[in-house]
Amino acid sequence: MAATLQEILLAPDTRPKVVSDAFALIQQEMAEKSGISAAAVKLAYKTASTFAPGHIQHMINTLLPGMADQLQPFWADFNASGGSAFGDYLAKHGDVASEAMLSVTDARAAASKRPIIYRAYGTVRGGAAKHVQAALPRVGDLVMKYAY
């Protein structure tokens, strides 16, 4: 087993698979969302998808190193504590883990040269933490798939 999430998730033969699985995870999360706040998230997702086909996959690939960096402290603590399900571990640390992940997207959105993307992100950022928290068990499962 590699020591860090960077080594695990960013390995040249693994990274494309991680991106593909993360895209599938996002699609599954979108399909299961309902309610008022979900409508805004779905609209932002559709805007990004329609504005530039393949943009979501490109952004997953672009954001992956930052996500690995932000999740690394959780991964290290999970391993040190002898945990068996990283998704459960992330869910228990949902507030902090979701904000760590969102710090990566916040920085990327702020640096975007595409105003429509930045505006779409801005409309959903306020409620994003709860959506990220809901996805943490699946995120952890995705990491575990490649870690072991």
Which functions belong to the PLM regions below?
Residues 1-99, 104, 122, 141-148:
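Hydrophobic membrane-targeting and insertion signals
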Residues 100-147:
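Amphipathic alpha-helical binding modules
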